[in-house]
Amino acid sequence: KIPKKLINGGKIMKKITLFFLGCIFALLASSNSFAESTMSQEGQYIFNSLGFYIGGVLVAFMAAGFCMLESGLVTTKSVSTIGAKNIGKFAICSIIFFLFGYNIAYGVPEGGYIGSFSIWSDGSEVGTGYSDSSDWFFQTMFVCATVSIVSGAVAERIKIWPFFTFAVVMSGLIYPISMGWQWGGGWLSAAGFSDFAGSTIVHACGGAAALAGIIVLGAREGRFTSSGGKRVMVPFAASSIPLVTLGTFLLWFGWFGFNGFSQLAMGTFDDV
């Protein structure tokens, strides 16, 4: 004989299940009406700008992730230099992209190749859909991520000041030009090319610069030695695997902002 408590419990679970199924069907039935509804211009401006800020904060965590990953993979003697290099890189990229990189990217004539070398100003209005300042913040984090790709490739191959010089050129010229070609409405955009979250503008651009760097700089000092007339690779012990693990999780966390907020809008039901 089935205990009475089990019978009552089964009835309760059945009611709960039916309740949640009803809620799901109600949401599905009303989703079309929600999708068609529109928010006011002021509401869209607020939520889109907030989206840029939240996404930018998440991507900023990637800077810490790159730093931890890079610090953990290099030899112990280079850890302090890597930390200083990553902090300096973040500051340099932010300043240079503010001074003229943003205008080079977004000041491109339609179908053109390069924007203007001038300091930008936030002239956004409610009708534009978002604040230019929030977009600058979000895009600046992308610049820092791009330069971080190169930073990891040339770790222990380059001194800190030459790298800072490269960071100025990368964040103020190379990256903004490639960004303007597509996201700024340049010739690639006019040709129909699309890059949703930086697979070309960020990763291919950063990867090409990193490849050029390691070809020019060569291997890390002491990485190879001669033995019996042959070139033998010397294994380098990583300074800290826990740092590598921490960096991996920080990058994983930051990527939700990097890719997710590349929608560039959260002012409508469809965007969200």
Where are these regions (language model features)?
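Hydrophobic alpha-helical transmembrane bundles of multi-pass membrane proteins
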Residues: K14-V272
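Short, Lys/Arg-enriched N-terminal segments with co-localized hydrophobic residues
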Residues: K1-I12
